[in-house]
Amino acid sequence: MAKNAMLCLLILRVVLALAFATNKKGDEEPENHSTGIFGKVGRVVTVALAMSSRLGGADATRGGGAVYGGNLKSNQLPNNNWMAPPPPMAMRSAKVYDSKHSPAEYLKKFAQDFRRKTGMHSQRHHEETTLEQEKRVAGAGPDPIHHQDTTLEQEKRAVPAGPDPKHHEETTLEQEKRVAGAGPDPIHHQDTTLEQEKRAVPAGPDPTHHEETTLEQEKRAVPAGPDPKHHEETTFEQEKRGAPAGPDPIHH
């Protein structure tokens, strides 16, 4: 503050000296002497005050900073053993992917890890499962209808009672005998021979089913003998053996 006052007085002295120096030149006009002096003094004082206020503001700003710094120094603790704050930790940048792998490989690896942790699998993974994989997953074995290319032996292992004969139309007669204890249906196999049907049906085959059977075969099948009308080409001796009273004269 003392410096500011000294500066203001110095400025005021210089201004007054200039004012009186200019007033000496105007001594020829005494009527305007007072007016000129006071007007010039007023202007000089106004300029001096403006300059002093501007300089005082700048000094106050510098002084305020010094006072603030002094206050900071005075606020420090007298104890020098206080713990210093820890240094700031270095922030590690988050790695989006490893430098050795490309972003596509990193995303693929991340997806695999996510599926392994959550137990999720893609649709392609399920479509690629084979029959052996399904057997391991399901203890009872796969569904035979689901795998239409399964063989007869695979279905026997899956179903204890054996496969359905209708499901495998190419099964042979021997395979059906093993599946069904009573034997196959004679009508189902049109190409079965007479000997095969005798083994399948104890009473023997139906004579009507085999029209090409001979007279001897029909005698073995029917104890009473064949019908004479059924064999029109029988001879006279054959009819005698068939009818004890002899043949009908009208018939021959």
Swiss-Prot record:
Residues 1-21 form the signal peptide. Residues 125-137, 144-179, 186-200, 207-242 have a biased composition (Basic and acidic residues). It comes from Globodera rostochiensis. Glycans are attached at residue 32. Residues 116-252 are annotated as: Disordered. Residues 127-219 are annotated as: 6 X approximate repeat A. This is CLAVATA3/ESR (CLE)-related protein 4A-2. GO terms for cellular component: extracellular region; host cell cytoplasm; host extracellular space. Residues 136-252 are annotated as: 6 X approximate repeat CLE. It is found in: Secreted; Host cytoplasm; Host extracellular space; Secreted, Extracellular space, Apoplast. Residues 21-83 are annotated as: Required for secretion from the host cytoplasm to the host apoplasm. Belongs to the CLV3/ESR signal peptide family. A- repeats lie at residues 127-135, 148-156, 169-177, 190-198, 211-219, 232-240. It comes from the Eukaryota. Highly expressed exclusively within the dorsal esophageal gland cell during syncytium formation in host plants. CLE- repeats lie at residues 136-147, 157-168, 178-189, 199-210, 220-231, 241-252. Its main location: secreted. Mimics host plant CLE extracellular signal peptides that regulate cell fate. May play a role in the differentiation or division of feeding cells (syncytia) induced in plant roots during infection. GO terms for molecular function: receptor serine/threonine kinase binding. Keywords: Apoplast, Differentiation, Glycoprotein, Host cytoplasm, Repeat, Secreted, Signal. GO terms for biological process: cell differentiation. The keyword Glycoprotein applies.
